[in-house]
Each structure stands twice: as structure tokens, then as C-alpha cells.
Amino acid sequence: MSPQTETKAGVGFKAGVKDYRLTYYTPDYETKDTDILAAFRMTPQPGVPPEEAGAAVAAESSTGTWTTVWTDGLTSLDRYKGRCYDIEPVAGEENQYIAYVAYPLDLFEEGSVTNMFTSIVGNVFGFKALRALRLEDLRIPPAYSKTFQGPPHGIQVERDKLNKYGRPLLGCTIKPKLGLSAKNYGRAVYECLRGGLDFTKDDENVNSQPFMRWRDRFLFVAEAIFKSQAETGEIKGHYLNATAGTCEEMMKRAHFARELGMPIVMHDYLTGGFTANTTLARYCRDNGLLLHIHRAMHAVIDRQRNHGIHFRVLAKALRMSGGDHIHSGTVVGKLEGEREVTLGFVDLLRDDYIEKDRSRGIYFTQDWVSMPGVLPVASGGIHVWHMSALTEIFGDDSVLQFGGGTLGHPWGNAPGAVANRVALEACVQARNEGRDLAREGNDIIREASKWSPELAAACEVWKEIKFVFETIDTL
């Protein structure tokens, strides 16, 4: 053994196990502008003090392990360790606490959501001393966000590409989601776009199955887009799902979409993974493609109040990794989403600077330092009677996506698209005239239906359809 090794191993080192809080609970710590800050909702096991639990979270998601190791003496733990700097009880909940943890920037690889999540939401979520753990929010410092490209294009560039301003964009997911041949699929796309929609969409689980291989779908969809554009004089698009079993195959599909002259492709970013998503986003930036993001699998991660990752964190991660649209829930449709919580992460997707606002679940002020914004996509169980509420809730910078609410029209796909476009134009005009969409929404739709038989038929079909269930994930 060399003298140097003897010194490191023998002086100032004491083997054994010590409380995490002795090293990682630092209530006097003043956070730095360059720190990544995290807010964890934690439920300690009975008998575990909250300070020890919070320190364990900081340790196990940064430099710590279960026992003292002599190699701690070979580095500066004070420089690299995470610190639990504050703990507060959760009002109305027994044995739940918000633990605030600060991470030094040196812990993370530049431009890698994958690496950031591997540390912050890695093994610590299986730690036995905790009954449950949920990451509620992250503060991404400008010094770190500037290492990411972010969305391929952003909201303003997309509007300029489409030449569409002053209203939400309209979309439709083609149904049935599985089983159509490529030609019949293309026909449905054409009918919806011709009827007045801006976009149609592959469902998230449409990849390249035996009933419809991806190349055939891309070709028939391209024909539908060019035909509908020629007939309407508007720029149209279809979210061609490039998600695949390998990154190489994903990129091949995106490249083919670009060769066809398509304006937008799609990716399932959680099932596909952040590494694949960032790779595709960079390709889209370099090649002029918009990128639509679906959040399939998110509810497995974010729906439970006491364990997992809140969607506001997944939304921030997507903005960093890259995407021009992302599904965000509807507030009024069939999918989970409380209004204030939803509007909180919608602002985190679209705006450049978002103030801390605990009433909407925003734990930290977030400055994106001019990173392009992401359009929220409201989709899931919505129809023409929801149009006024959706316009009022989400505003112009959004995509309102009606699948069954288009294709379920009694007269067919094109009339379903007409009904949605008429309803949207009526709501936008009424809002611009100063009318209150929240109070007068149904009256506005009824007035418009008097001169649109397509809208009148849609109103009759869906007049009794509501999805009234208690929200699980509330503030």
C-alpha cells in the first residue's frame, strides 16, 4: 500500500453507517442561481424523521450511498452533493412533506434529459425508508437550459409556416386507431382536412403493423394532404408517427416524411425515450419538420398524488428535449386534468418566464431564457359543445383535437370537420367581440348552428355527453 493510499484510507475516515441528515440536511444553505432545484412530496416510513427522509432523498439522488466509503476522501463532497435545504408539511395530509433539494450543476451532463432524470428520479424512488415519493416540480436554471436546443421550431415559427393566426389550430385523431388499411386511412385524412381541419393525427399506437405498414400510410397520407391543400387553399398537415423499435428506424421514417414534403412528424416521447426524442428533435430543426409529441404512458408515472412524477415536470423535460406540440389534457373531456393544475403546466410549456404560484402547483419561478414554446394539445373526449370552454381555457396558442368528435358525426368525416371549424370560428369571433365564452358559450354554439346544418347535427348527437368524475390528482 502506498503512503498516499494509507493517508487517505487511514486519516479522517471512519467506516460504518451514519445518518444522512448529518451530511445532506442543510437548512442554512442558500441556493445558487445555477442549482437545479427539486420539490419532492415524500411520505416517510413510520419512525423515520422527515429531516432524515429528506436528506436521504438528497443523498441517494446525488453522491450518497448507504454506508461511508473511503473514496469519499478523494473528492469534494461539499461541491457535488445534493442538499435538502427545506422541509414543509403538506396541509391536510398525515405524514407527508415537501422536501426541497438543491443539486449543483456539475452533477449533470449538458443537454441530456436522460442523464438528469437518471440521477433525480433514479433508484431513490425505491428507497425502503420512504413509503412513497413524488417529484412535484423542478427549477431548471438558465445555465443548464441553455445547453438544450429545445423545441425544433416553436409557436411563432409554426404559425408562420402554416400562415394561420388569431385562433387555436384544429386537429383530429383518425379512428379506429388500429385496423384500417393505408388507403382507407388516407381517405379519412383527406375528408377531415377538406372539411376544415388544420391537422389530422396518427394514434400513438399506430407504428408499422401488419394491417398498415408505415411506408404505405405515409404515401396515402401525403396524397390526402396535397389534394386537400389544392382544394382548400390552406396549408394542411398530418402527424406521421415516426416512433419505432430502434432510433435508426425512427430516423428512416422521419427522413422519408421529409422527402415526401410533409410538414410534421410525431413521436411518443415517454415510450420512445428521451434520447430518441432529442435525436429526432434535432433532426426536425435541421430539416424544417415540425414535431408533434404524444405522452403515452404518462398516467402510469404522474397520476397518483403521492408517488411518481408530476406531469409539469414531464412537460418541462419535453420542452428541453424538444417538441412543438404536446398533449396536455382537456380539463373538460374524458381524461384527467384539474383546471388550475393544467393551466400551470400549460404556461410552463408556452411562456418564457413563469412566476412561482403554489395555487397552480408551480413551486419555482422558471426562466426559459428565450427557449421556444410548445403548443399544448387538448385531446380526449371533446366535441362541439366543449368548443367555447376549450377556447376560453387554452386561448389561441393551442391545438384542439377532436377524434370521435369529428369522425363520429352522423353525416360523415367531412361534415364532422365542418362542424368543428364552424364552432371554433364562431367562438373566436364572439370572443373578439367581447362576449363571455364561459357564460355564453352554449348560446354562441346554438346561434352558429342555425346557419350550419353540419354543426346543428353535431350538437344534437352530443348534447347529453359529459364526463363527470372526481379528479384524482388535485392540489
UniProtKB/Swiss-Prot annotation:
Modified sites of kind N6-carboxylysine: 201
Documented EC number(s): 4.1.1.39
GO biological process: photorespiration; reductive pentose-phosphate cycle
Pfam families: RuBisCO_large (PF00016), RuBisCO_large_N (PF02788)
Note on cofactor: Binds 1 Mg(2+) ion per subunit.
Name of the protein described by the UniProt record: Ribulose bisphosphate carboxylase large chain
Binding site for substrate: 123, 173, 177, 295, 327, 379
Modification type N6,N6,N6-trimethyllysine: residues: 14
Alphabetized NCBIfam families for the sequence: PRK04208.1 (NF003252)
Job description of the protein: RuBisCO catalyzes two reactions: the carboxylation of D-ribulose 1,5-bisphosphate, the primary event in carbon dioxide fixation, as well as the oxidative fragmentation of the pentose substrate in the photorespiration process. Both reactions occur simultaneously and in competition at the same active site.
Record note on modification: The disulfide bond which can form in the large chain dimeric partners within the hexadecamer appears to be associated with oxidative stress and protein turnover.
Family membership noted in the UniProt record: Belongs to the RuBisCO large chain family. Type I subfamily.
